[in-house]
C-alpha cells in the first residue's frame, strides 16, 4: 500500500529549504500561531514534520482526515485559525493553497518553488517570494496594504 511504503522512508525525497527554521523561529518568538494545513494524510504529515524537526513550530498539523473538507475548500484554514485573529495569511506553493486562502478571505503568499505545475506568478497569490526568509517582509507588506 502506498501510504505504508511512503511512511517507511518519509524523508527520502523531502528537504527543509534554506531559511525555513530561522523564519519559523522568528515568527514564533513574535507570538505567531502557526499551523500546517495539508492535503497529505495526517499520519504522513505528522511523521514528516517530526522527522524534519519542524513539528515543534506548529500549534496544529491538519490533514484532510482532521477537517471537514480538503483544500481548496477553506475548512483547513478556518479550523486552524479558530477565531479572534486579527492578521492571518497562508504561505504555500500551489493553486489549492491560493484558492483555499481566497475562499477563507485571507491573503496568500506563494513560493516560486514547490509542487505547483503552474508558474507561481500565475496562481493569483497576493505575493510571490523566492526564499522562505522573505516571509516576514511579505507579511509586513500585506499588513501595510490592508491597513
Regions found by a protein language model. Name each.
Residues 25, 29, 41-42, 46-147:
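Asp-based, Mg2+/Mn2+-dependent phosphohydrolase catalytic module
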Amino acid at each position: 500500500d502506498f501510504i505504508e511504503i511512503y511512511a517507511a522512508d518519509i524523508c527520502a525525497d523531502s528537504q527543509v529549504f534554506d531559511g525555513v527554521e530561522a523564519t519559523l523561529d522568528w515568527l514564533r518568538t513574535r507570538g505567531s500561531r502557526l499551523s500546517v494545513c495539508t492535503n497529505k494524510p495526517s499520519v504522513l504529515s505528522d511523521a514528516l514534520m517530526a522527522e524534519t524537526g519542524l513539528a515543534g513550530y506548529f500549534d496544529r498539523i491538519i490533514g484532510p482526515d482532521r477537517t471537514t473538507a480538503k483544500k481548496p475548500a477553506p475548512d483547513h484554514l478556518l479550523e486552524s485559525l479558530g477565531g479572534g485573529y486579527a492578521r492571518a495569511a497562508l504561505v504555500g506553493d500551489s493553486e489549492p493553497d491560493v484558492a483555499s486562502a481566497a475562499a477563507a478571505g485571507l491573503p496568500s503568499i506563494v513560493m516560486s518553488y514547490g509542487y505547483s505545475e503552474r508558474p507561481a506568478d500565475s496562481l493569483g497569490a497576493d505575493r510571490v517570494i523566492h526564499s522562505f526568509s522573505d516571509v516576514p517582509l511579505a507579511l509586513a507588506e500585506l499588513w501595510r496594504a490592508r491597513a
